[in-house]
Every structure is written in C-alpha cells, then in structure tokens.
Amino acid sequence: MHLQKTALVLEGGGMRGMFSAGVFEAFLAHQLTFPYITAVSAGACNILSYMSAQPLRTRQIIEHYVTDKRYFSVRNWIKSGSIFGFDFIFKELPKHLLPFDYAAYRAYPGVLQVAATDIVNGESIWYNQEALGQDFIPVRASSSMPFVAPVVKHEGRALLDGALLAPIPYQKALDAGYKKLIVVLTRNEGYRKKKGVPKFLLKSVYKKYPKLWDIMEQRPKLYNEQLEAVEKMEREGKAVIIRPQIPLTIDKFDIKPHKLLALHDHGIGCGIAAIDRIKELEQQ
C-alpha cells in the first residue's frame, strides 16, 4: 500500500535506532511506502535499506559487523576523530560486504529529506535523494554527533548532527503540506531531555563555532517542545507515534549484539501492531 496523504518522521538515537530498523521491517513486510520521509541521524541511516527494499539488511550488519573495530571503536576515534567508522559504514559495507541496491533506492516512490546542522549559521540544511549522492555524505553529516565525530565539510558548509536542531523533524513534513504523520521515536513514553552540554566544554572544543554553543545549550528545550508537538498531534488524531513499549536498557553507543537484535525484534512487533492504525489514519 502506497500512502498518499501521510508522511513518515524519524528520530535518531544512535544504536537505539535498531528499534526503528525493526519498524521498517514491518513496513516492508506489509509493502507500506510513504510519499514523504523526514529523517535525522540514525533514522536517516536506517531508512536507506527500507527504501532499497532489502529486508533484514540492517540486522545483518549488526549480526556480522557491529563488533568489528572498523564499525565502532576507540581506535576509529583516535585515527579519524569519529567513534563510528563512517568510511567503513558508507563505503566498504554498501559497496562490497553487504551490497546496497542503489537502483531500488532511487526507484523508491517517495521523497526523502535528511537534515544536517550548519554549525556556522546555526540552521538545518535539508538534502533530498539526489543531493545525498552515492556516498551519502549528508547522511554521514546528519549522524555526526558532537564530541564523537568530526565536523563534516560539505559544499562549503560545516555540518554536524541533524538532530541538534530537528531532533523530531515533523515540521519539515508539515511545511511540505502533509497534515498526517507517522512518527517513529526511539525513547520510551514519558521521556524528557533534561540537561544540555556545559558551555565551557563546548567553548573549549568548538571555539570556532559559537552558534553551536547556543544550539547545544537549548537542545533539551527544543527536543521536549518537538516531542510535545507530535504527542499533541497524536491526541488530536493527526499522528500515529510508534515507540518502544518495553523499558529501554540500551544507550546510543551500545554495541552488544544480543541487545540490539532484541530491540530490532521489538521494533518489528511494534511496527506490525501499528499497521492498522496507520491505514486508518491515511483513510480518514
């Protein structure tokens, strides 16, 4: 079923994104496609294998490569400034080890919009499929979290994590004219972000980017406001929120395969449970 009036909105969350990847498996199994997708960070990474219609590809990455030091390690951070091995993730894996179906991805019947944060100007920069290119540099930028990944220089911009300004990128879908949303979150109901990063630490690491200091300081408030906005839409019958229904015991840097695979299984279950609600929302 190809939805026409309902957009898909994806939170990030690092390795908690395996929940979202499970939800996408349910969408693939039910041949559910969306006309418009907005994504940041891990959400942007994991949606790619859904768009290329490659079931269980993300799961196979976890099963075979998540403990590989090329994927995630302190060694990566020492060598490249990134704890995640982005060259391995965006080049070696899709082009050689677990081939990515670029043709199927390009044929996906909808628009993808991925945000990265311009830390010079303090604004979200959006990239569609064409702008992402074959190496997905904007997705890499969107996934580059402060302190554990270097600033990505792309097309004259200095970019970091798209979730800094658009943690739950629902507004982009509303601005595109979509009034109904499916929102995939990677936190339990009731979660609120509480603390920002101390400004003195930001000033010491990111001296050249004062806009980033303010963004990081305001991040908890911004996250909570965006979360409350989509929860309000759900109460009004304008959105379906899919999020973990069991207490999360995993953080964004957890690479224990058994925990990630269990979270993926849970995501599949939550995705299947939401299918009827998604179809009902579309038909309203």
Each PLM stretch: what is its role?
Residues M1-V40, L48-Q284:
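Patatin-like phospholipase
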